[in-house]
């Protein structure tokens, strides 16, 4: 067998080193330099398992067990387990607290992975209503309506799921209202915090949630794949049931999950997370500044206003107009940004785009704003 492996050698990526990255799916997962130094010794497979007694969450060296206890405090929950991502966390809950054929009531902004997870768990779903263009906000009262409808139809409801912050518009849902509805109706409540936990303050108990699904690589300054599942103790027996064959292994975790760099990167970045969520108001302020400065150019921010999250989605008819006469067509914006050392915007997109300035300095934010202004003013 002959395989040419030259293409796999010297693979490089310079986006973070040489450019300002505006990709909202990546801004929250950028690992601080000090964390990169700590994880150097854990490159190898199963590197965290040197002193394992049979289960990942009980490892004392490195102190994974203590980290998970501290993370529970950070999220305002009782018990935390590492997973490979928020989608795996959601599936673990669905596959344990629901019975086959049950309904999951979820919001109209739910991520595709919520649907994939419930399909894999052989569940049905009922989608709640959201506001129409241009806000697209979740309507909490719709949960009560959909629950009543399913109950009247004698359908079994297994779970209430809410996307805390959706990836399309960056809207922050009213968790307390939905949580109150879930509690009053007597159903378990799962909050998808893929775009919130690690970026902004979260307290599960204050929010009335039973489960939190978090993403390490999306919002917690960690390498991927890595996530967390945080639960209330009342659901410990259901969600963390152990194997009949190997009594120490938890079924929904398939024994153990993140066994190397991802979990260590999350641990190494924990101090950074604790400090950065304290600056959330400043992140929102920077985001609102971007919107206020760019809308007069012909950008139209969609989603709730004013912004309460760092994800920004712009409709950009002005870019479409420029693309019609520019010989580069829809690629001009990407190329002009690249010339100015800015990346993370999808190539060829001019009708609309998403961006985030989360974690950037004020001077970097100003540079991004001024760069976009100069592109529009030069080419319009």
Swiss-Prot record:
Subunit comment = Homodimer. Interacts with SepRS.
Q: Record keywords: NADP included?
A: no
Single GO biological process annotation from the record: translation
Question: Which cofactors is this protein said to need?
Answer: pyridoxal 5'-phosphate
Species of the source: Methanococcus maripaludis (strain C6 / ATCC BAA-1332)
Name the SUPFAM superfamilies for this protein. Answer: PLP-dependent transferases (SSF53383)
Q: What is its EC number?
A: 2.5.1.73
Q: Name one Pfam family in it.
A: SepSecS
Q: Which family does it belong to?
A: Belongs to the SepCysS family.
- Which reaction is this enzyme known to catalyze? O-phospho-L-seryl-tRNA(Cys) + hydrogen sulfide + H(+) = L-cysteinyl-tRNA(Cys) + phosphate
For this chain, one GO molecular function annotation is: Sep-tRNA:Cys-tRNA synthase activity
* Stated name of the protein: O-phospho-L-seryl-tRNA:Cys-tRNA synthase
The source's superkingdom equals Archaea
Role, per record: Converts O-phospho-L-seryl-tRNA(Cys) (Sep-tRNA(Cys)) to L-cysteinyl-tRNA(Cys) (Cys-tRNA(Cys)).
Residues binding pyridoxal 5'-phosphate, per UniProt: 86-87, 192, 215-217
- Provide the alphabetized UniProt keywords: Protein biosynthesis, Pyridoxal phosphate, Transferase
Which residues does this entry mark as bearing N6-(pyridoxal phosphate)lysine?
A: 218
